[in-house]
Amino acid sequence: MDRFDDISEGEVDHSFFDSDFEEARKGDSSSVFDKQDDDAEERTDKDTENVNLKLGLQRKEDDLTEKGTESSGKTPPEEHPVEGDNAQTGNSSSSTTSSRSKLGNARVEHKIHLPTPNSLPQTVKDGEHDYYTDGEESTDDEKKHHVRSKSAKLPNNFKKSLSKKYSRSSSSSSLSLSSSSSDTGCSDTGSDVGLSDSSPSPKKHLPGATHLSPKLKYKPGEKSPGAHASGTKPKVGDDAEESEDTVTDVTPLSTPDISPVQSFELGASSDRKMKVKRQENVRQEVYENVEDLKNNSKSLKSAKKGKEKHEPSLTSKSTALDSSLDHRYKQKVLHDTMDLNHLLKAFLQLDKKRPQKHHFDQPSVAPRKNYSFTREEVRQIDRENQRLLKELSRQAEKPGSKSMIPRSTGPPPKLYHSALNRQREQQRIERENLAFLKRLEAVKPTVGMKRSEQLMDYHRNMGYLSSSPISRRVRSTLSQYSSLKGASRTSSATSGLSCKSERSAFNTTGGGLLLRPKPPNVRTAWL
């Protein structure tokens, strides 16, 4: 209640307004608000002077206000005076001079509707347990809260006005700042009027709840932005910048009810549906076009029929002309086809005649080249040649026909003895060759073809040669064997023969010389 006494005595605390506006300057980040705050301070000084002049009139009306406070303490505050205030504050934006005069009247009306101090602690106990219970401390805190909330709400009003016009933003900001300064100096209900201007809801018109428990405005769940601002901002430790951040993003974000994958699927399905609809529309258009064509054809036919009925003579003449033209065209086509057929037949006949002429001319022309014989003689010669060819082919087919033919001709001719000897010698050579060939074919690889075995054979043969005289034939074979050193199979065969001959020679002489036993490994080539 000290606040009301200070106002009645005509003393205004300018430092309080300066501190409040300095806090508002800290909250405002834009350069536009800095300029407008300077203008607002000058105007608030003028408003305070006007308030000091009008305090004399307000003292006379205190008696009336006390009666009004008693009636308002017993009954709840009505909505009509606040609505009147809203109307007056709304009209104050038209001109600055009219707004100041009306705000003076609004202060008088606010004093009428102020609650009694008896009702203040009751509202504190009922609505809010976190705030102070003393009337003075609670009112001082309320004063700070409302001033901060008002100063925090001003940037939003400025932002809305700046988006429209710069001139309107300057006028509205000056009016709002002047009204806020005058309201804070007179009473706390000025903040309620500002709040009711931004969000006129019936739940906000309880003065006790708005002054002492600002959280109650947020608890009932009001959806207007003014209610959110009044519910979130009036905290003692919060700064102006934090309050601006909380005020800007108040509206709930619209979360999609469908996941992005489903939305893509729905989009694809919608695209398919649109394509199907387009195809159906195209089909319908095609069908409609076909139906239109049919209808047009029917209409044309009906029109032709009507014309034929009205003009039978003309139609008969036209049909006669058409029939004659068709007949002529058909005749031309028939003549053309007949001509083509005749030409094809002629070409085919010529093609058939040409090979026949060649076939008949060949036998007549060929015998004329040989003028030594007549045609009959040539034919007889051909027949004889054909017969001889057949006989020769038959003889060639029979086996042994060549050997039989010379024997059947006659006895063999007589030969001289020299020829006979040559023939016999030749036959003997052939027989030996055949026998040698058979031996070579039957020969298998020998076992003793190693170097050590060949050396043993060589030394043994050399011992045989040095111990007894041997014939020239044996010596020649041994010399050949020693030179070849058993490299070939023929040499091994000759060595075996030489060994046999040596044995036979020793046996015939009857010498008592002892011979080395033949190793069992050594074998002849033909065994």
Swiss-Prot record:
InterPro entries: Cfap97/Hemingway, Hmw/CFAP97
Coiled coil regions in record: 273-310, 368-443
Bias kind Low complexity: ranges: 92-101, 168-182
Region (Disordered): 1-322, 393-413, 506-527
Ranges of biased composition (kind: Basic and acidic residues): 1-28, 58-69, 270-295
Keyword Heme: no
Pfam family, one: Hmw_CFAP97
Keywords assigned by UniProt, alphabetized: Coiled coil, Phosphoprotein
Protein family according to the UniProt entry: Belongs to the CFAP97 family.
Name of the featured protein: Cilia- and flagella-associated protein 97
Organism annotation: Bos taurus
Gene of this entry: CFAP97
